[in-house]
Amino acid sequence: MAEAEPLPSPDIDTLAQEGIVLVLDQITDPHNVGAILRSAAAFAVKAIVTTARHSPEATGVLAKSASGALELVPLVLVQNLARALTALNERGFLTVGLDSEGSDDLSKVELREPLALVLGAEGKGLRQLTRETCATVARLDMPGEIKSLNVSNAAVLALYVGASRLGLMGK
């Protein structure tokens, strides 16, 4: 069986200060992370930031779910997500956490580049320190009885809203 080297993980300080970055707060399901990667590639996301622990390995199920996106969207593995968010804030990123209890609908939040959209694990959502480190916490308003989505579906909806509002569609 042939073995391959893992894809390199860039440093958070080398991320382009433009476009959109996704930040994943302890999303452990490889199907969800793979689907998020695939959507991220479709929306030209610059990178996905996630913790080295409490995230699935970039192999097997995740790679299959990502449909080739692992080679297109850099994964930035960090030890401490709150510190990574602080670094993004210091580098000029607008960090927007997504939570059903957010104060404003994402479509009403004044967005700018560079933008970091922060998604929490299903069930638990964003951890408290993650929420506190985000510049703002927004929600995705929906007209139906169910007010929350699977995290991979929430990611694609947030990416669409963000990319549309920032004028990144069709670039």
Which residue ranges define each predicted feature?
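Post-transcriptional modification and biogenesis factors for structured RNAs
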Residues: 1-171
